[in-house]
């Protein structure tokens, strides 16, 4: 019928059948500074726009599983090595589940936080379309948000970045341990948020990014760089990406205040050497307002 759109009917049907998270409707932006975001308890998915840097959006999830279903497969594409793949591609749902099983991981603990440029999200959705990969409902909700906020658009059946320099971060709320889901303590939430926020700073502050590259290449010695690369191999990062190594180095070294996530023993150095690296980073006066450890 003229003037009638089936799209709302499809969404309502999917919601009724449990195929879409209830957060799919009315997902907008809430302004908030670092402390407000960190200290606010939310029962449903909330998307914050960071007051200190309006190019950073923070997806604040009530549960790790929903966060994982939204971002894990995208992070696998952008940050991890794709074995036996001649070209970048999005894994099917079954392939990704098998991949997580091989790592003894689940949607809940594959990653505890995420950081993505809008341009990387465009890559994910275009590759998924190219290979006719079925998206999870949570991934569809994310795509709809990006379209509704004018961050991406569709042109000739391809997704394009409209604001390619906007950064999407993801963090979980505090939660107790449940069967199949690890706990997230207050300290862990703070560490995850600060860690991911440092990635946002790296992406949106070119002076800070340049400082970090200089620190990696000129301040750290070969053994220290190898220590970070070896650690990141254990975390399944794509260590062939030099830019990723620099970005992760600064985030773990200076902005991960949780010994369960990062410590001298995990890096394979002494406490004194770790303290020395942090001191070198601070003494160089990095151009950032983030709190340095």
Indicate residue ranges for each PLM-predicted region.
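N-terminal secretory signal peptides that target proteins for export/translocation
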Residues: 1-6
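Classical Sec-dependent N-terminal signal peptides that target proteins to the secretory pathway
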Residues: 7-26
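A metal-dependent hydrolase signature that marks the N-terminal structural subdomain at the beginning
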Residues: 24-170, 286-293
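Metalloprotease/metallohydrolase-associated module, dominated by Zn2+-dependent proteases
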Residues: 164, 218-293
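Short pre-active-site segment immediately N-terminal to the catalytic Zn-binding motif
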Residues: 171-193
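Short, flexible loop/turn elements at secondary-structure junctions
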Residues: 171-175, 198, 206, 258
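Post-HEXXH active-site segment of zinc metalloproteases
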Residues: 187, 204-231
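Active-site recognition of the HExxH zinc-binding catalytic motif
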Residues: 191-204
């Amino acid at each position: 019928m003229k003037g009638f759109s089936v799209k709302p009917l499809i969404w309502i049907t999917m919601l009724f059948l449990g195929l879409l998270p209830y957060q799919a409707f009315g997902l907008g932006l809430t302004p908030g500074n670092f402390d407000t975001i960190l200290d606010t308890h939310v029962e449903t998915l909330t998307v914050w726009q960071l007051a200190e840097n309006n190019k950073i959006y923070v997806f604040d999830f009530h549960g790790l599983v929903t966060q994982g279903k939204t971002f894990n497969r995208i992070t696998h594409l952008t940050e991890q090595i794709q074995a036996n793949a001649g070209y970048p591609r999005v894994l099917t749902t079954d392939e990704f589940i098998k991949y997580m099983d091989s790592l003894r991981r689940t949607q809940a603990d594959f990653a505890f936080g995420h950081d993505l440029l809008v341009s990387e999200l465009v890559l994910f959705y275009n590759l998924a379309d190219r290979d006719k990969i079925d998206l999870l409902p949570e991934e569809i909700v994310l795509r709809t948000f990006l379209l509704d906020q004018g961050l991406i658009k569709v042109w000739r059946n391809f997704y394009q970045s409209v604001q390619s320099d906007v950064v999407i971060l993801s963090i979980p709320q505090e939660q107790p341990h449940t069967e199949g889901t690890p706990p997230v303590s207050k300290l862990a939430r703070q560490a995850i948020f600060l860690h991911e926020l440092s990635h946002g700073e790296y992406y949106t502050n070119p002076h800070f990014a340049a400082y970090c590259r200089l620190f990696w290449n000129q301040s750290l010695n070969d053994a220290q760089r190898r220590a970070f690369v070896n650690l990141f191999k254990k975390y399944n990062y794509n260590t062939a990406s030099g830019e990723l190594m620099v970005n992760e180095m600064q985030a773990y070294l200076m902005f991960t205040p949780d010994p369960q996530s990062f410590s001298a023993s995990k890096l394979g150095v002494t406490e004194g050497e770790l303290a020395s690296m942090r001191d070198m980073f601070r003494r160089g006066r990095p151009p950032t307002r983030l709190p340095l450890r």
